[in-house]
């Protein structure tokens, strides 16, 4: 009887020790709106909306042969300094990986309108940040 209890105890201990740990729940992506020249801190990293290098998106109220593209530069600092060039058009790079974070440009506001020029200071980059 003692041997049977000892055997059951050993089997229970072995089963518990072999059980896999439940994987950590993934962190949901964080969406932020970053004004031109503004910065945000995320996990020890600083993300700054540094520049709009081009904006050839098709203006609202017009017909274009393609949707166009806007390109922005993010200055990334934390563990080293890097510049990320992100685009609104999916044919070009929209995401950048930096220090275990994936940064994606989802939208650039405002959208161009026919006959109007956008002041660089009115741009807002909509980004998702995911670890």
Regions found by a protein language model. Give the residues of each.
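Mature extracytoplasmic domains of secretory-pathway proteins
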Residues: 47, 51-89
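Short, exposed beta-strand-loop hairpins at the edges of beta-sheets
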Residues: 110-120, 126-128
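Sec-dependent N-terminal signal peptides
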Residues: 5-13
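Charged, amphipathic alpha-helical segments
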Residues: 42-62, 101-114
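Short Fe-S-cluster ligation motifs
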Residues: 89-107
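Post-signal peptide N-terminal segment of mature Sec-exported envelope proteins
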Residues: 26-43
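C-terminal motif of bacterial Sec signal peptides marking the signal peptidase cleavage site
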Residues: 15-17
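Bacterial signal peptide processing site
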Residues: 19-21
